[in-house]
Amino acid sequence: MVCGGFTCSKNALCALNVVYMLVGVLLIIVAAWGKGFGIVSSIHIIGGVIAIGVFLLLIAIIGLIGAVSHHQVMLFIYMVVLILVFIFQFIVSCSCLAMNRSQQEYLLNTTWNRMSNETRLNLEKTLDCCGFLNTTEGRDEFKQDVALCIQVCSDPHKCPSCGDKMLNHADEALKILGGVGLFFSFTEILGVWLAFRYRNQKDPRANPSAFL
């Protein structure tokens, strides 16, 4: 049978959703591992990663059940959800790729200000740095951060700011994040196309007089 028939569409859709399931499980495992080993202490970060993993897992389960059973309603819900996820993910990915250094600095500064002291100290310990950026506007806060982390930094007299270290890698990280996001965006479009095509194909084993 040539690829494009009922069986081929079904197998391709199942394979795509198995990949989504593996990615979802991997996100959950990585988040739990990071929390267990103390790599990330913020419950908001851990909860966000786990929520994304669970959401992706649920979408994959709906798509897999719909593909195996050729369930019209499940396949329709699957397509609608994937389209919405694609739109959101595409916008976020393009924003990551288009972000300049000043925008990166503003975003990192906003994130830094929302961090708890415990999260800041863990980040400073991991990056071997103190404070965010020693700017005119944030000099007082920078001095307070340096005073808190002076024992954490391996070399207190030559301790760089965390903002400088993060900005040095932010551009590369955003490009990777945007590229991976765009890749998954197009796999979601592939999933929508496969689900639409498969949904409108008749099961050759079904009753010929039955609807699809």
Curated annotation (Swiss-Prot):
Topological type in the membrane: Multi-pass membrane protein
Tell me which residues are glycosylated.
100, 109, 117, 134
Q: Which UniProt keywords apply?
A: Glycoprotein, Membrane, Transmembrane, Transmembrane helix
Topological region Extracellular: 34-44, 94-175
The source's superkingdom equals Eukaryota
Which segments does the topology annotation call Cytoplasmic?
A: 1-12, 66-72, 197-212
A single GO cellular-component term from the record reads:
membrane
- Record InterPro entries: Tetraspanin/Peripherin, Tetraspanin_animals
Task: Give the main location.
Answer: membrane
Where is the chain membrane-spanning? 13-33, 45-65, 73-93, 176-196
Pfam family name, one? Tetraspanin
PANTHER family, A to Z: TETRASPANIN, TETRASPANIN-31
What's the family? Answer: Belongs to the tetraspanin (TM4SF) family.
UniProt-recorded name of the protein: Tetraspanin-31-B
